[in-house]
């Protein structure tokens, strides 16, 4: 059922509208859409070229004349139709997307170089913030700084093993002993070392401890092996000679007086050459050893020794004139003195001819001053000269 209802407007006139059984309020948005549809369907005549510009848009008067408006709508239109954003009306999603898409594409074209350079700018900014102002770009990290400290210590002539021990003492807060140059190197990198010590958990301290350990190991590996100091005098080397029956049998007699003289009389033990004498003479020898429990040698003993040597020299000269072979004489004397083997008859007769008895009167007595011993010593000196 269609009915008619009247409502007084702001100017006192009545507005009439038709309604059905299910009345629905007519909103302002619906009226706006209806008015826009009516205005779009009606023919529009373009204004002449010389016509003055109207103070309002062409569609606004038609909208004002299309239907009766409320006082609020009329006031809103007379103020210049503010935008929906200014009036507090939410913007439709389609309009927002349509309006913002061209602007977004334009901004994207303009900002592509900036976005490409953004990672480099962020990296440079992070590097600038991380690097302290006082350090060189080559030694910004803890490990390069630790290697630089070790290099400065080596250039200062420091012993890395000692520095490693002293650095451990610093970290423990114990006493340390450093030279002035070493202390200056540490103060360059640890300014608060003397009053506050060094934090053992800091990154630089850990890196320096590891760098000192590596450098100390490398220095120890490069150092030559320490050998005990050698004597400047070299002992002359003797070629090993085959042991004779005399040497092998006389080994047990070396502790006795007879064995000592037998060792002096053997043919293989000769006096060293002049070169060996020159080398052995360089050794410091105590020419005056302390004499303990020794009786002073009397003048008669010295005279007796000299007389025995003189007699032996004279006897050797006489035997040589008689045609006795000195090597045969030496072998016969050694065999008799060591083994008590009988002296050959021709040599025994020659010895008796020069006044020397060719035998020991009592073999158990001492033979030091016996004429045969003096003759053997003189013969050995003569042959070795």
Swiss-Prot record:
It is found in: Secreted. Residues 1-333 are annotated as: Host recognition. It comes from the Bacteria. Residues 217-234 have a biased composition (Low complexity). InterPro entries: HopAB_BAK-bd (IPR031759), HopAB_BAK-bd_sf (IPR038342), HopAB_PID (IPR033743). Residues 1-61, 73-139, 215-293 are annotated as: Disordered. Keywords: Hypersensitive response elicitation, Secreted, Virulence. Unlike other effector proteins from the HopAB family, lacks the anti-PCD region and cannot inhibit cell death triggered by AvrPto/Pto. Belongs to the HopAB family. Interacts physically with plant cell Pto. This is Effector protein hopAB3. It comes from Pseudomonas syringae pv. maculicola. The lineage of its organism: Bacteria, Pseudomonadati, Pseudomonadota, Gammaproteobacteria, Pseudomonadales.
